[in-house]
Design a protein with these regions (language model features):
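An N-terminally biased module of ancient metal coordination in phosphate/nucleic-acid-related enzymes
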Residues: 1-63
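Active-site gating/metal-coordination segments in enzymes
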Residues: 46, 58-139
């Protein structure tokens, strides 16, 4: 069995245009989910772990969480959804809103894992503020 273990889907609604314009960056096009699944299946891939990426602290954007939801709804037997959250808020404190979002995705929406990106979220993986997130994931 072949599984693509890490890929991102793009939805242009998730990007903050003023931030990208200010930095001279182009916003990528939406991922064509049907075409992507066709290509992956043609390559022998049976499942795909897909995830967004929370990048609010650096880019004031998130990388396609909406697209993950759409893809999983359309192809629930193909996509394995992961959510992505920044666990620490702008003031360096526990991010309750993102914690609640993550728990809902894992417990009620069929999500199977979580992507944390310390460089984008500007936190350390061993920060004690992370522990409640790890504990919720471990349940």
């Amino acid at each position: 069995m072949y599984i693509d273990s890490h890929m991102h889907l793009i939805n242009t609604k998730c990007f903050d245009r003023p931030t990208y314009d200010r930095l001279g960056q182009l916003i990528p096009k939406d991922t064509d989910i049907n075409q992507l699944v066709e290509w992956m299946k043609a390559a022998g891939i049976e499942h795909c772990v897909c995830m967004g990426q929370d990048m609010h602290k650096v880019w004031n954007s998130e990388f396609g969480e909406v697209a993950v939801e759409d893809a999983f709804a359309k192809y629930p037997d193909f996509f394995v959804p992961f959510c992505s959250v920044e666990p620490i808020d702008e003031a360096g404190r526990f991010n309750q809103k993102n914690y609640d979002y993550m728990v809902d995705k894992l417990n009620n929406k069929g999500y199977r894992g979580v992507l944390f990106t310390p460089p984008y979220g500007q936190f350390n993986s061993n920060d004690p503020v992370m522990f409640p997130f790890y504990e919720a994931i471990d349940k």
